[in-house]
């Protein structure tokens, strides 16, 4: 009788430990890569935007758009505090104030700058996905990475913004 009680207690108290540890908070803080080149697909304000994103920390961010067709070929480049908008052979330098604050390129830039500044806070790891929280002017951003620190997804609460990155490569080689 006592043996059965011990087995039941063991199952009730030891088994949950194995089940709960599948997704846990890891104390080691894996560093997010802020220099990369990737393809992206972003749901932004009920619009699907695709293109290529390259970032080198806060030095250079380039967003080249493939779709929708109305913006295909448009490229937005942030070089420090300078902004360039280009399409085909036309390049226009502008002040960042000309881009609306909650626009797709500006939200993307602010999140990537926050990552480069080290403001993303590690929240946990589940299997091979690490999750970070980043407080921004647009609300709470959730950044997901693989186990090597390569960004795979960015979403922003309070904005209709969810970006999925694919074919992510290190910009440093």
Predicted regions and their residues:
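Repetitive helical segments and hydrophobic/amphipathic motifs
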Residues: 12-13
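Flexible, processing/modification-adjacent segments and terminal tails
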Residues: 28-36, 40, 86-138
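Gly/Pro-enriched, hydrophobic low-complexity segments
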Residues: 62-69, 74, 120-173
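An acidic-aromatic
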Residues: 55-114, 159-162
């Amino acid at each position: 009788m006592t043996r059965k009680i011990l087995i039941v207690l063991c199952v009730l108290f030891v088994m949950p430990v194995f089940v709960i540890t599948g997704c846990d908070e890891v104390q080691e803080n894996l560093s997010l890569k802020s220099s990369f080149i990737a393809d992206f697909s972003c749901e932004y304000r009920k619009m699907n935007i695709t293109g290529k994103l390259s970032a080198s920390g806060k030095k250079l961010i380039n967003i080249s758009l493939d779709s929708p067709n109305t913006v295909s070929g448009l490229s937005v480049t942030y070089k420090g505090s300078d902004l360039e908008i280009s399409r085909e052979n036309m390049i226009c330098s502008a002040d960042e104030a000309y881009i609306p604050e909650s626009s797709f390129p500006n939200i993307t830039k602010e999140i990537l700058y926050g990552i480069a500044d080290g403001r993303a806070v590690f929240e946990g790891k589940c299997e091979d996905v690490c999750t970070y929280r980043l407080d921004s002017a647009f609300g709470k951003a959730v950044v997901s990475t693989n186990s090597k620190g390569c960004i795979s997804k960015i979403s922003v609460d309070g904005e209709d913004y969810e970006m999925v990155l694919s074919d992510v490569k290190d910009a440093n080689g």
